[in-house]
Regions:
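Extended, subdomain-level signal for the structured scaffold at the beginning of enzyme domains
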Residues: 1-117
Length: 117
């Protein structure tokens, strides 16, 4: 039996302040979802994107110059691109639990002051 050509990219539903008092939000670091998405698609995989709540927000810092190439930024900004349609159709992780996947990629959020006990 061969493995399914399906990948799951799990992103965060977090929407929090990036820097204390900075006014910018954290969430999905776009390159961390876009880069593997492009690799999986180029390898012929179907790709699902899911999050805890079926929602997402972009990390402000991830859209600043230097984090995405001009081509990647164009792909992200184009709401009709496959990547952006998949991001915007983001479903709850619980809704994809029964799908057979051969690759999983998780992108979370780090809270530096979180209680780690």
């Amino acid at each position: 039996m061969s493995l399914p050509r399906r990948a799951l990219i799990a992103v965060t539903s977090a929407h929090a302040e990036l820097f204390e008092g900075g006014g910018h939000t954290t969430g999905v670091f776009i390159g961390e979802a876009l880069h593997p998405y492009n690799v999986f698609k180029a390898a012929g995989f179907e790709v699902d994107i899911a999050s805890e709540e079926g929602t997402w927000t972009e990390d402000w810092l991830s859209l600043q110059p230097g984090f995405l190439s001009p081509e990647e930024r164009e792909q992200y900004d184009d709401r009709s691109s496959e990547f952006r349609r998949e991001m915007d159709a983001n479903v709850k992780a619980a809704d994809v639990l029964n799908k057979d996947v051969s690759v999983q990629r998780l992108h979370g959020i780090d809270f530096p002051h979180a209680d780690r006990d």
